[in-house]
Each structure stands twice: as structure tokens, then as C-alpha cells.
């Protein structure tokens, strides 16, 4: 018997979906899991028989009764995913669906597909969901799987020496302003440094642009000191789509892995974890975020940095992913 895990290739190297699956697979392979590689492509170029042969090749190493962790979605469409699951059922594999994203919730125009996704999830022996909020949402939508595990936090594995963060009264934001346009005109007293190509903004905006940088470069720059800002696509939390409160933020893991505290909105699914562990601040507005940084003392900052330092080790070594993967395997084999 083997434990297998699916992985994704063929997307842009900047794709968060690809990076997340690659990271989880890297950590799973440290546990001895076998990789099943998917390529992102136009599945409609395949006939049904061609798709079947493609999946047979991908699954050639899967044995009868194996455990398979399916990182969902493959982004090749539900037809591809369902065909893969159907073949696993023939092999009587134990199926663990590791839900990274739920497209019908992520894209409201695709909500009509929700019953089909729930049906796919219900074929699992266990599911891993990002948060308690996502679990409750999927149960309300018809999820019937008994064994549900909570991920809670993304890991951010890396292997390079970082700086020791020093107090700096500024905020970082790692994300394209095309997706977060309300940050272009940031006018609060606390300076905001955005890792994104420069955009035209109000001359009075207190914003500077750092351009796009690689993951190692980003960690190195963040680790010099400051605080990491996590925020949604809307300025006002009341206007934020529901989905951002169901999934878990990659940004928060990046900042914490770099060793700096975070400021997150109260609707973030793991905001309570950040509050309880003293890893930063939970706020209800960007104005409050700026005010907190303005009033932060060097001593308060260094106390937080020390707590973040210990927590960042968990993210660097991949303990959140490893734990939930091991727990899931234990569940389906018990």
C-alpha cells in the first residue's frame, strides 16, 4: 500500500494555485508520499478515450487499495476531476480530497455548479478544508463526509537565511494592485510598500512600489522589518465577498514565515488564531491598521517578533501541512 498525492504543473510560476499544490507535494514527499502529476491544459482537446488513456498514464503507479490525496481542484475542470475520481473508485482507493479552493464559491457566476462539486466531495473518505467556516459552508451546501479535517494555515517552506526583523513603522502588501485597486490611493499616515508593478495613483498617496520579486527575494525584503498587511479586494469589510472569510490567506503565511507580525481583517478565517498567538493585530478597517502601526512601540514590536519567530519555524518546516496530511491518512486507515 502507498500514499499518493496529486500535484499541478503547467500554470504560470507566479500562480498561487500552482505554488500551493507544489509546496504541499514537496512536504508530502518528505513523508514518503508518491506524486501523481497533473498538467494544466485544455481538456476539451481530448476525446473521452484520450482523457481516459491520459489518466491511466498518470495513475499507473496507483495500486489497489492505495490512499490518494487529491488536491482540489486540478483547474482542468470538473469533468477531468470526476473522471479521475471514478478511476480511483475502480481501484477501491481511499480518497482524501484536500480542498484548496471551491470554484463555485470563489466565482459567483459558477455557483450553479455547486451541486456537482458537492457530489465529488461526497465521494471522499475524508476531506481537508481550509477553515471551520468553509466546513460549515460546505455542510450547509450538502457535504455528507463524516471525516473532515481543518487545515487552518498555509505553510511557506524555504531554505535560506533571513534578516532579524527590526522595528520599522510601515506596512507591506504582497499582491498585485490590479486585484486590490483600493490600495492605490492609500492616504493614511503609515507608509505602505506594495510588491507590485507601479500604477498611477493620487500624488498624495503614501504608497511606494517594489515591483514583482521572486519568493526568496520577497522573504528577504520582508524580514528586514515592518508589518505585513492582509486585506481583501474591498476597502470596506462590509462589502467583502464571503469567500475571503472561508479560505485561508497565503499572504499571512508569507509574512509570518518572513518573521514579521501581521495585520489582518476580523473576517479572515484564521484571525482568531493570529489574535490568540499574539502574531499581530486583528482590525476592522484600514484606518485602524494605520493607527496601530503609528502607536506601536519598539518593545511591543520586538515582543511580537519573538512570538512570530517561533511560529515561523512551523511554516518554514511545513508542520501544518504535514500534520493535516498524516491525520487524514490515519483517519481513512483507522
UniProtKB/Swiss-Prot annotation:
Biological process (GO), any one: protein glycosylation
Keyword Lipid metabolism: no
Keywords linked to the UniProt accession: Glycosyltransferase, Nucleotide-binding, Transferase
Keyword Transferase appears in the UniProt entry: yes
EC number: 2.4.1.-
One Gene Ontology molecular-function label: UDP-glucosyltransferase activity
Consequence of gene disruption: Alters carbohydrate composition of cell wall protein GspB, about 20% reduction in platelet binding by whole cells.
Positions annotated to bind UDP: 16, 179, 249-254
Pathway: Protein modification; protein glycosylation
Enzyme class: transferase
Domain notes: Dimerizes via the C-terminus; dimerization is required for tetramer formation. Binds protein substrate via an exposed loop in the N-terminus.
Assembly information from the UniProt record: Homotetramer; a dimer of dimers.
Family: Belongs to the Gtf3 glucosyltransferase family.
Described function: Required for polymorphic O-glycosylation of the serine-rich repeat protein in this bacteria. Catalyzes the second step in glycosylation by transferring glucose from UDP-glucose to the terminal GlcNAc moiety of the 3-O-(N-acetyl-alpha-D-glucosaminyl)-L-seryl-[protein] resulting from the first glycosylation step.
NCBIfam families listed in its UniProt record: PRK09814.1-1
Name by which UniProt lists this protein: Glucosyltransferase 3
Gene that this sequence comes from: gtf3
